[in-house]
Curated annotation (Swiss-Prot):
UniProt-listed Pfam families: Mqo
Species: Actinobacillus pleuropneumoniae serotype 5b (strain L20)
The name this protein goes by in its record: Probable malate:quinone oxidoreductase
Gene Ontology biological-process entries: tricarboxylic acid cycle
Keywords in alphabetical order: FAD, Flavoprotein, Oxidoreductase, Tricarboxylic acid cycle
Gene symbol of the encoding locus: mqo
InterPro entries: FAD/NAD-bd_sf, MQO
Length: 491
């Protein structure tokens, strides 16, 4: 993709800030639903999808709640609540439907380059955790969305599902796992690149190496963006609608916009590390996404997982994440990001959340100081035979947890202007996997007047639009069959 030439002043109906999966998804929606709208994208880096959307910067799981235990909460009475898992599964189905539509209509090609079928497994150790996992399985198995899920404590069965992890295990160790065959691995970096290739072909203006420095509301209701390119040349860009999808960089721009709902919002950055396997023989022995259970007192982002990934055209194996303490909101950000994000309007909320989350800060600092030997010890809970020389450390992307009302939130959140002329996406997990649902929320809240005329097209693109798939077993079966065929997941 080449950088677009730009005048000192410019205009577009729609402006997307940040060239990641969220902006790419919203751009695809608007290109399909309102092709008459002009579209401009500003990205501060030299290519699209280099920050949180990049395949080396996220877990790439295709978060559909098939194996992530932090989406199913155990209540005080011992029951397991699966409502959030069902909701995330429904949301991920929307993502699969949009990608299928884009492939089916030739907007993007070669789905095998960004999505693969891979089993999803939940893995726990100890009797108490085994009982929790069994209750989770029993609750989820009642839904057709999780049809085919299996549960076992039997070591021989577990060895069939995850042979690498079961080598040289103590036969008396209490283990349990749930297994579901139709999980996915999604390379969101590759998908992001495909989405922006499509947008550029549809005459979207892609401006790389362009940093948005300021956002101001004009008297006529439009937004004025002050943009600086790599050579330091300043540009003024006006737009009717602005979406801030710059990952961790979204918060400072949201604050500069001055919209009411953005004034009390803060952010807390968390960095991440993964161990990546460099031994092809070891990589070949594992073919699954295996998610464990966070240790007592550890935050949700610390859930350990051993992931088969498909990156740069080959199978890879990653373990993590190991969290870390940072002041940066972006991997290529500044140590001033966090301090300068604290303003008079959010100071009380950020301070309150900071006091409440001192244990989290302590945990992150401890994680940041772990040696490779300590990280290998964590890995050996999953892979007892893991050898130091087979594993290297890679630095993953940044996530910025939303702080609102004195509370730290562990999800994604859309914040918008009252008139719907500006929206920003903040937060993290499940993130990219539910990007389609997140951008649908933007369409509904920001383009309400146009939504009625888009209904038929939206239903064509997303057959489950407006429906709860948990209550539609027949529709779900039809959608799954189509998705598997179009995205080459059936074999």
């Amino acid at each position: 993709m080449q950088d677009s030439s730009s005048a000192l002043e410019s205009y577009s109906d729609v402006t997307l800030i940040g060239a990641g999966i969220m902006s790419g998804t919203l751009g695809a929606f608007l290109t399909e639903l309102a092709p008459e709208k002009s579209l401009a994208i500003f990205e501060k880096l030299s290519a699209v999808g280099l920050e949180s959307s990049n395949e080396w910067n996220n877990a790439g799981t295709g978060h559909s709640a098939l194996c992530e235990l932090n989406y199913t909460e155990q209540k005080a009475n011992g029951e397991v609540s699966v409502e959030r898992a069902v909701k995330i599964c429904e949301d991920f189905q929307l993502s699969l439907q949009l990608w299928s539509y884009l492939v089916e209509t030739g907007r993007i090609q070669a789905p095998r380059e960004f999505i693969h079928r891979i089993p999803h497994i939940s893995f726990v150790q100890g009797e108490q955790n085994a009982q929790f996992l069994q209750k989770r399985y029993q609750s989820l198995a009642q839904s057709h969305l999780f049809e085919g899920m299996q549960f076992s404590r039997d070591h021989q069965q577990l060895a069939q599902w995850m042979p690498l992890m079961m080598q040289n295990r103590d036969s008396n160790e209490t283990l349990a796992a749930s297994y579901i065959q139709y999980g996915t691995d999604v390379n969101f970096g590759e998908l992001t690149r495909k989405l922006f290739d499509y947008l550029v072909k549809q005459k979207a203006e892609l401006n790389l190496n362009h940093t948005v420095k300021n956002i101001q509301r004009l008297a006529n209701g439009e937004w004025k963006l002050t943009v600086v390119d790599q050579q330091g040349q300043k540009r003024v860009h006006r737009s009717k609608f602005v979406f801030i999808g710059g990952g961790g960089g979204a918060l400072p721009l949201l604050q500069k916009s001055g919209i009411t709902d953005g004034k009390n919002v803060g952010g807390f950055p968390v960095s991440g590390l993964f161990m990546v396997c460099n031994n092809p023989e070891v990589i070949a022995k594992h073919n699954a996404k295996v998610y464990g259970k966070a240790k007592l007192g550890a935050p949700p982002m610390s859930v350990p997982h051993l992931d088969t990934r498909f990156i740069e055209g080959k199978q890879s194996l990653l373990f993590g994440p190991f969290a870390g303490f940072t002041l940066k909101f972006l991997k290529q950000g500044s140590v001033l990001d966090l301090p300068t994000s604290v303003t008079p309007t959010n100071f009380c909320s950020v301070t309150k959340a900071g006091i409440k989350n001192l244990p989290l800060a302590h945990y992150l600092m401890k994680q940041a100081m772990l040696t490779k030997a300590q990280r290998m010890a964590d890995l050996r809970e999953f892979v007892p035979d893991a050898k130091d020389e087979d594993w290297d450390v890679v630095v993953a992307g940044q996530r910025v947890q939303v702080i609102k009302g004195g509370e730290m939130r562990f999800g994604t959140e859309v914040i918008r202007a009252e008139d719907g002329s500006l929206a920003a996406l903040l937060g993290a997990s499940p993130g990219a996997s539910t990007s389609v649902k997140a951008m649908l929320d933007v369409l509904v809240s920001c383009f309400a007047a146009e939504l009625p005329q888009w209904q038929a097209k939206l239903t064509q693109m997303l057959p489950s639009y407006g429906k709860a798939l948990r209550n539609e077993p027949q529709l779900y079966a039809q959608i799954k069959q189509r998705v598997d065929q179009v995205l080459a997941l059936a074999n």
